[in-house]
């Protein structure tokens, strides 16, 4: 059931530019400093999910959690490319001891991967992003990057089986369940401090 949310988040992240921004781009292309290129962002982050908490009968929950990683690879294979630049966020596949830090499972790994994704986007400077991922939290970086790029002239539509509005310290520590609150500038202080903008 969570994969449907991931697929939809990938589609929605690709259409993140608002009507107002599209009009500005089409009528004022020569004077705008923004690029209108579309990139594919392969973001196979799996650490935001805690499969063991969601499906306790799974025999090897850590191995199953990496299914998010495989899902990103499958989406990359199945979704038509269209010739745009493809960036792949480096995501660790190592499973060590999974830790909750300040209320977020695997927070330090997620923070490193967030920084890497942002660095890639800043270097590429895309106007649109098609995100193919991993868990729901892979939408946080693209949404907040585009919110900063278009000065808040971005609307976020989040359709998922779960609202993804939990906070650090809530009973479930998976970051994928905190994706919307992170996009809105709330949540783990270290992660939120790295995000370029908030979606109001």
Question: What is each model feature region?
Answer:
Residues 25-200:
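Conserved alpha-helical scaffold segments that buttress catalytic/binding sites
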Residues 10-19:
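Hydrophobic h-region of N-terminal signal peptides that target proteins for export
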Residues 1-7:
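Bacterial N-terminal signal peptides that target proteins for export
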């Amino acid at each position: 059931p969570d994969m449907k949310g991931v697929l939809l988040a990938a589609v929605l992240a690709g259409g993140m530019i608002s009507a107002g921004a599209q009009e500005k781009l089409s009528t004022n292309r020569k004077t705008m400093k923004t690029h209108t290129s579309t990139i594919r962002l392969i973001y196979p982050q799996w650490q935001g999910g805690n499969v063991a908490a969601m499906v306790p009968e799974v025999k090897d929950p850590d191995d199953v959690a990496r299914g998010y990683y495989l899902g990103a690879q499958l989406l990359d294979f199945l979704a038509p490319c269209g010739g745009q630049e493809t960036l792949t966020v480096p995501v660790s596949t190592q499973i060590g001891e999974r830790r909750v830090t300040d209320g977020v499972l695997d927070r330090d790994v997620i923070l490193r991967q967030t920084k890497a994704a942002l660095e890639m986007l800043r270097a590429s400077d895309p106007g649109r992003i098609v995100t193919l991922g991993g868990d729901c939290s892979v939408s946080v970086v693209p949404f907040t990057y585009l919110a900063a790029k278009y000065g808040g002239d971005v609307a976020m539509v989040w359709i998922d089986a779960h609202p993804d509005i939990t906070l650090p310290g809530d009973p479930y520590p998976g970051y994928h369940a905190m994706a919307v609150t992170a996009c809105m500038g709330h949540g783990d202080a270290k992660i939120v401090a790295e995000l370029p903008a908030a979606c109001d």
